[in-house]
Amino acid sequence: MIIESIIISSDLSGLVNFAPFGIKKKDDLIFISPYFPSKTLENLQINKYASVNYTDQATVFVDCLLGKKKFKTNQCKKNNSFFLQDSLSHDEVEVVEYIHDEVRPTFRCKILNSSINNRFKGINRANNSIIEACILASRVKLLEKEKIFNELKYLSIAVEKTSGEKELQAWNKINE
């Protein structure tokens, strides 16, 4: 199963990067598979620590995709990284293995600490559609335009029916 998350990693100078990622989880391990090239890939190769953040706020995914990465963070407890203050929960991880691949290598990461940060308040269908639109936007070079437009048209149904003001603004941003 793929779980949508926000990975926070940093380079050796401490510059933090926020990236939306579909990760895989098994027991006390998390598998992160970034495409070449990516800042997350670079950071995890040189700094073995990161956090995997779980949020129900689709606006975070949109802002990451659009490069508006000004989020409140706190220091992790068990590694030299940060986590999203507004996330529902997060896992603090350490890279224990690098599995090489020409297109999409994998970092096998051990979970050092898991924390619950905020209460889950329920599911809004518009958020799911917005996250799916972000995934489509990140794959513009890989997918046919017609497929993307058809998917967005379908996803817009849930946004139109169920979104609040914040979700509608995020939807409009991702569709610009």
Predicted regions and their residues:
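Basic, polyanion-binding surface patches
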Residues: M1-H90, E94-E176
